[in-house]
Amino acid sequence: MTDIRIEGAKIIIVGGNSGMGLALARRLLGEGAAVTIAGRSEDKLAAARRDLGDHPGLATIAVDISREEEVATLFRNSGPLDHIVSTAADIEGAYQLLPTIELMAAQRVVESKLYGPLLLAKYGAAHLPPSGSITYTSGVAAYRPAARGSVVAAVNAALEGLVRALAVELAPIRINAVSPGWVDTPIWSFVAGDAKQATLDSMAQRLPAGRVGRPEDIADAIRFLIGNEFTTGTILHVEGGHRLV
């Protein structure tokens, strides 16, 4: 495998202020990359800076990737980049049975996990070199859907279709996605509420891997996709064997 150099690379991580994105930012900064974390919440961006120790290679910027002009401005001001990553997902209120789901909650999932990634490619690709990459996160719900998860399952599947199409259209820039399984991140507070830990523990007992994922597991997978110059149009499953049970 030829591993693309990360030291000195300029990388934008959308959604890097918590969970998987924050773990990735920590890893890339440790390898000498210049990392910009983009997110909607100034408070969460400030918390990420504190968590990462105000690293000299770190910058943060407030942006809503569902708003086209904000995405255009992000890249207008970014200059040349090497890689773009998005772990952003707004699923608050989306895990509901059909009789109770609100369309606005479904719309937020579409905006954060489909429209947003589309806009990142539309405006970001021109700033990437031929060796550059864009990496998204989809999710196991596209393969193992469950009650209350219809919206997330559908949007994850749509994002994976977008990945394959963009890999052809934007070649030789590489476009990939990591499909995580159940990962212990703050997003579970929206999904399970007070039952978060019990829910994750129950899934850990089912999985062949014997545990749920950690943010670092997904960061490792994204790092692989960034670095492997012969991988494109690929969905990398990192889910502890969830699709098997």
Residue ranges and their predicted role:
Residues 17-18:
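Conserved glycine-rich cofactor-binding loop
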Residues 211-238, 243:
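C-terminal substrate-recognition "lid" of short-chain dehydrogenase/reductases
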Residues 31-47:
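Conserved glycine-rich Rossmann-like NAD(P)H-binding loop of the short-chain dehydrogenase/reductase
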Residues 160, 169-185, 231-238:
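Conserved Rossmann-fold SDR core element
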Residues 52-69:
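Rossmann-fold cofactor-recognition segment
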Residues 196-217:
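Catalytic Tyr-x(3-8)-Lys segment
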Residues 90, 97-110, 114-120, 131-171, ...:
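Catalytic loop of short-chain dehydrogenase/reductase
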